[in-house]
């Protein structure tokens, strides 16, 4: 019987027979550097051929081809690279390689809604493109588009690459990835083509990336490039509350995530002199904020609006606050679309530890508690207690256990330590810092006149692993480029509210983070918590910090120090590690987290230079979540261990299988990688710990985060914390958390001096997802990986150093309010961060 010839429809409307030879040739042409032993071209062509339908368009065929390759990625990670190349070639067919023509399409865009000219790039960028078109064409290198894996490319396609209207509601991507990088470089540096080329080359080769808002908006008519905004509640009045809400709505429609403190809002039942009535308190008000966050998104389906609400635990509405995100209870007492953080004074932790009482206060009758920290706070709080100003007195542990219960069920509230954040801040001369941002890595001063802002970028650490060693010199060079770029963004940024511009130009903070720390360890064959990995962790962050300080000092020599430099710790020769040492001496804390510098860099002469000429930026280092941009560059997220070695990641752009490429390469080298091994790893939820045929060294190297002691993660956070002048987004991971485990972790983090004790608590579902690819009988035969025991997770945390805080029963909740935790979290393209991450 003759095989029916299938016809496909070309882009010009003509039809032609489907030709497997053409498809095969196209794949073969993209196989450079791909392992042809594991990537079976013939099988791929066969499967695609079976999926071809009569009349299918060639664009749909391109999509089928790329998706078919992508879903084979669990067989070998090179399938992901091949799929990315197939998708990129499809994009290149419909876009121009001419930089000038590409910018012309964006500049001449006409809105389908208004039929008016609606350019997607700025007039400045269009003028530069016309003036320097030949030079820009020489700078750009389209071959680098073929370095993206499919997951990374689809993330770009979904949200980052600029689109134009094609009628009937259709939006078409007209920007190539390389053109996006060039747009960003031009948006930051304008006509300084030397800096444009430098930035473009480093970004397009994956050494660093600017944060998502910068990639979205640089070079556009409204270049809002900032990731994070911190807002102060203006005042405790209807005018103050709604003015602040309006301010947040304006920021949210075009910007990143927002952190806001509510410490000064009077509690429920508090007297209102103007009406002779009583206040409804925080909870009803926060439901209004919740609805605003839902309503005011950031346009075009790119990102949801998101607010993180911070509250100190002495506030009389704290119990209702802790219930707002829970899954059960009265709807009028819930606001689940907001995020919640605690701004915790040391005194509260001391009262919990000593089984003491805790007095809840109303800021209307016990004012100024949020305006002070340290001993000044303790003195004022205890004075109010003696004066009987409290609303009610409870056992401190009663509140503590409600905090833990909320974290087990929802993953929040975040835990930030007010005294550490303030004492170790280079902005402490400005006043008391009252909150962090949506992702807990930004710690900046706010007031009714100042909205704190931060511009972010992340450095891709795997790019600095060369020939089995880490290249600190190259890391320093790239960090200085990033610092100069972020400083430039401050001046070229579009600010949604005037208070943000005022603050950012005065203090000029930036936030430099990292991605791919776990990848760098894997490339160097270092298990995550190995002593050499811990040493590398310290050296990486010391190098980043000294490079950033040095670059900021060089900028100050040229342009002058930031306006409020005088009186800052840096102006007195105190950098971040000096503040850590000073804090520990003042508090009489042990010195177990103090380490000498790595010896590579000359800190003494740099500090002398800082005192002499100043710094251009008040703050520099802030390791943030990097969910979106690490997806783009193909790295593990930020500072975290691998969450799983095989999993499916769900984002706005689709569901994608992800496999640990480093593990696969090791298993190939050992001749252990095959379908049977792949199925075993899937059956064990991405763990290799229970697979005895894998050598112990490899099993240790590829432990997933659930198998790593959280004490080690906290120790490493404290080690690098000496070189982090803002804070860090530190997630903690417990498969089945108990109150005892959580208490142990929180107190250990606090005593180690961390500013952010916990971003999200990640836990695992009570039952494994059904694995449809496995025979149930085969699953029974598989050994299970070792679960974290209490001792394994925490070691000697708190042992012999403090009185054990009382145990409560294990809370039997999955982390329903936090992202899916059977692997990395479900995201909308930005993980738990949603808006703020790099």
Swiss-Prot record:
Binding-site list for dTTP: 236-238, 253, 266, 273-274
Molecular function as annotated in GO: ATP binding; ribonucleoside-diphosphate reductase activity, thioredoxin disulfide as acceptor
Region feature Disordered, mapped onto this chain: 780-838
Listed CDD domains: RNR_I
Site (Interacts with thioredoxin/glutaredoxin): 833, 836
This protein's record includes keyword Amino-acid biosynthesis: no
The protein's role, per its UniProt record: Provides the precursors necessary for DNA synthesis. Catalyzes the rate limiting step in the de novo synthesis of deoxyribonucleotides by directly reducing ribonucleotides to the corresponding deoxyribonucleotides.
Name assigned to this protein: Ribonucleoside-diphosphate reductase large subunit
Organism of derivation: Trypanosoma brucei brucei
Taxonomic path: Eukaryota, Discoba, Euglenozoa, Kinetoplastea, Metakinetoplastina
